[in-house]
Amino acid sequence: MADGGASSFIMLVTALLISGSVSTILISEWNKVARAAESDERKSAGSLGVSVDFAGDPMMVGFEDPAVGDDELTVYVLNSGIHEMSTTFELLINGVAPGTMTTSIAPSGTDWLPGYLLEITASDSSLSYTDGDDASLFFVGISESVQGYQHSATMNKEVRLNEI
């Protein structure tokens, strides 16, 4: 009878040691999961304040006819978010990237802050539009670093071209 009690005690101590080791591993892994979830939450919270919108009348987008002069299309994009946007972007006109693009920011001229406009003048010899043509614009831009992350913002707009 004495042997049964000692072996039961040894089994109890062994089970407690094993369960203690397992719980330590589980707590460590749970801590890693919690940190990853916190990082993802912080990253996604910053993306909520990043957005851009078309500025102006989509039925009156100015362009210059190549037959008359330079083939330029001028588009205004508003930083409608709460974070500063980078001037790194891509603009597609009917799915094609223009050969040359120049930009300016109003009113600052340098930083694309919330509420500021990015003026994009796109030109390409392959742009052959006439007054009243419709064009599909797609814009994607990135934010400056927000809590250590950069976020993208997109704009898709159907516009009507108006010869200047």
Predicted ranges, named:
Residues 9-38:
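C-terminal juxtamembrane segment of a hydrophobic transmembrane alpha-helix
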Residues 1-4, 8:
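Membrane-helix interfacial "entry" motifs
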